[in-house]
Each structure stands twice: as structure tokens, then as C-alpha cells.
């Protein structure tokens, strides 16, 4: 399906080379301030046009809110947003028709939809479709702010180069002032070199990102189905190219003795809390009030300028393809922005479920 969420539901639509990408957001209370500029601001964070090989399409985001907003405020009705596709060059993909790219969803889409799948630019499986998720995230982030919560992320690994520095949440937010959101300057320099190397080789690189959510109130999530971690993980794996996820200290935690891994419980400002936060803000599927943090990894972009073995499905014969069109050397930076967005959507959904944001009366005025 193309819908995510229970109380806050988003339905995305559109393909990479179609007329538009879009999203319908249902469940937003009336009275939330929202403009097209709010959405465009978030979309521009995913562009990275200052590093052309990360976004050769570099498409100015033309955003239109079609419904659900009047005079700068939400109406409590479904919000429909479209982002128009303008810089489309489908001719690059003509020779790839019925010749699925190794590592790409082309092959799976053929198995499911037959000849009817749209292969141009990756179609429905393109990273371009995450623009719709980012648009929904712009709304969800505003909803989180009502509860005093916010989301931010950074790149922790790219092309095998890992960060090696201690940092705080404030450092994560400040990293967005750099060419890429990386807290470690030495690692950033090496990552930029790796990007240049991949472009020269006609190849691609993967990597990992970390997303934080701070100010999230305790008590969100359910003991079994509806765990906050499960919902965020499901959302994370909806992003094209996602291959792995670590919550809190993740695999490092799995290697510890139980006595080391446990977060001691203490009292601060008259309230119980965790003295440390190795677990990443969630116990038993329920938030405990400490910061949420997790890491996700994304595979290298499947489209590369190197010969790759595939099958001509029209003839059922082996063949070789070499992509000649535009491609992102890495999807990791864009994926980070999408992961921030879908995390915000999942958390806003749970705030509505818990009654911490209500829809039965308008916000503000």
C-alpha cells in the first residue's frame, strides 16, 4: 500500500518522471500554521545542489497545496500537496526498457506488475518519490513542536568513511551548516573525496545516518503491536535503499554484559529518568522521555556507469547494460532528510494516538 499511519495518515503518489510527486495528509488538526514555503524549505534541505554529483537533476521544487489549508492555517481536512516534476529526461531510459538494472527495484516491479511498471528514472521506486515524504514531514515537524519535540539527523558513514568524534544533539543540528551534515570535519573531508572518487569511477557509494528526536514525551507506543520502534522501523524501511537499522547503541549494546548494557534509573528534577541512554529512549516499545536516537544504513545507488549483467525480459536472453543517464553518486544525504521526515510523521501519529495533540478543537486562535 501507499499509506502510512493510523491517526495521522499519509498517502503518497507519483513517479520520478510523471507529472508530479504528491502526498495527501489526513489527521492534522485545524489551526496549525502552514504555508507552501514551510514545505519548500524542508524540500530544499534534500537538494544538495552545491555537490552536483549528489543531485545532477537539481530540480527547483515547485510546491502547491491543493486543499486543507486556508489563509495560512490548516482546516482539519485532508491536506493535498503536489511537487511538480520539471527536469525530466526520459530518453536516457529507453534502452533500459525490460532490462532491469541489477540492485534496483526494476526487477521486483516487473515480477509484480509485468510490463506495466514505469522504469523511467526508477518510477515509483525512485529516490525522487521521497520528496512526498519530506513534504509530509514538514507538517509533522510542526505538530511535534506543539509537544515541545523536534527531530534532526546527520551522516555517520559514507563510502566506508566513518565519523570518529564525540558530539551532542546541538552539534548534530549545527552540522547542517557544512557542505554535508557531518559532525566530524576530518571525516567530512574524506567523505567528500570519496564522493569525487566514485563520480570519477562512474560508480556509487552507500553509508549510514543517525536521527535524533528530543523532547518526545514518555508513554508513546504500545507493549506489542504498535511499539514505537516497530512503527519507526517500518517507516524507515519505506525509504528506497534502506538496508539496516540500529536502535540506540544497537549492535554495540548486544556485545555487552547485561550489567553494562542496562541504563541505571535515577531521579532528576523530581522525576524518574535514565542516568544513561544506551537504549535510545525506548523500553518495551514505549518512550521513556530520554532522547530517541537510531542509525540506518543505505546501499549504494544501483545506477552506475559500468557494464552490468542482466536479462532482456522481452527476449528472455542474457544481456549487459551500462547506464548513461543522470544518477546520484550516493542517496545517503537525501535519504537522511527523508528519514527525519518519516520519523516525525510516526511520532506525530503517536502523539495523536495518545491524545497529546487533539483534533476535536482547533489549535491556537
UniProtKB/Swiss-Prot annotation:
Reactions the enzyme catalyzes: 5-O-(1-carboxyvinyl)-3-phosphoshikimate = chorismate + phosphate
Catalytic class of the enzyme: lyase
Pfam families: Chorismate_synt
Keyword Hydrolase: no
Pathway: Metabolic intermediate biosynthesis; chorismate biosynthesis; chorismate from D-erythrose 4-phosphate and phosphoenolpyruvate: step 7/7
Assigned keywords, A-Z: Amino-acid biosynthesis, Aromatic amino acid biosynthesis, FAD, Flavoprotein, FMN, Lyase, NADP
Disulfide bonding pattern of the chain: none
EC number, as in UniProt: 4.2.3.5
Family: Belongs to the chorismate synthase family.
Name of this protein: Chorismate synthase
Phylogenetic lineage: Archaea, Thermoproteota, Thermoprotei, Thermoproteales, Thermoproteaceae
Amino acid at each position: 500500500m501507499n499509506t502510512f499511519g493510523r491517526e495521522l495518515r499519509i498517502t503518497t503518489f507519483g513517479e520520478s518522471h510523471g507529472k508530479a510527486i504528491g502526498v495527501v495528509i489526513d489527521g492534522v488538526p485545524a489551526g496549525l500554521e502552514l504555508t507552501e514555503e514551510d514545505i519548500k524549505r524542508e524540500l530544499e534541505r534534500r537538494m544538495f545542489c552545491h555537490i552536483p554529483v549528489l543531485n545532477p537533476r537539481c530540480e527547483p521544487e515547485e510546491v502547491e497545496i491543493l486543499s486543507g489549508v486556508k489563509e495560512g492555517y490548516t482546516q482539519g481536512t485532508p491536506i493535498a500537496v503536489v511537487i511538480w516534476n520539471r527536469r525530466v529526461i526520459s530518453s536516457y531510459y529507453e534502452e533500459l526498457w525490460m532490462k532491469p538494472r541489477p540492485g534496483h527495484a526494476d526487477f521486483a516491479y516487473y515480477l509484480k506488475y509485468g510490463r506495466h511498471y514505469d522504469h523511467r528514472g526508477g518510477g515509483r521506486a525512485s529516490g525522487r518519490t521521497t520528496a512526498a515524504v519530506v513534504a509530509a514531514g514538514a507538517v509533522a515537524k510542526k505538530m511535534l513542536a506543539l509537544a515541545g519535540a523536534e527531530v534532526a539527523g546527520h551522516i555517520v558513514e559514507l563510502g566506508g568513511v566513518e565519523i570518529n568524534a564525540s558530539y551532542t544533539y546541538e552539534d548534530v543540528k549545527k552540522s547542517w551548516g557544512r557542505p554535508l551534515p557531518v559532525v566530524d570535519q576530518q571525516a567530512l573531508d574524506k567523505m567528500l573525496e570519496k564522493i569525487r572518487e566514485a563520480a570519477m569511477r562512474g560508480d556509487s557509494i552507500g553509508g549510514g545516518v543517525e536521527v535524533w528526536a528530543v523532547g518526545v514525551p514518555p508513554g508513546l507506543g504500545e507493549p506489542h503491536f504498535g511499539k514505537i520502534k516497530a512503527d519507526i522501523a517500518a517507516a524507515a524501511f519505506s525509504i528506497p535503499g534502506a538496508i539496516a537499522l540500529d536502535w540506540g547503541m544497537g549492535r554495540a549494546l548486544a556485545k555487552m554484559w547485561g550489567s553494562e548494557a542496562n541504563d541505571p534509573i535515577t531521579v532528576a528534577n523530581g522525576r524518574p529518568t535514565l542516568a544513561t541512554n544506551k537504549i535510545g529512549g525506548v523500553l518495551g516499545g514505549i518512550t521513556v522521555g530520554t532522547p530517541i536516537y537510531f542509525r540506518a544504513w543505505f546501499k549504494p545507488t544501483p545506477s552506475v556507469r559500468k557494464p552490468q549483467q542482466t536479462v532482456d525480459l522481452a527476449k528472455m536472453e542474457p544481456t549487459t547494460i551500462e547506464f548513461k543517464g543522470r544518477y546520484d553518486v550516493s542517496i545517503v544525504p537525501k535519504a537522511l532528510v527523508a528519514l527525519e521526515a518519516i520519523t516525525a510523521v510516526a511520532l506525530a501519529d503517536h502523539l495523536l494516538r495518545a491524545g497529546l495533540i487533539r483534533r476535536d478543537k482547533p489549535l491556537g486562535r
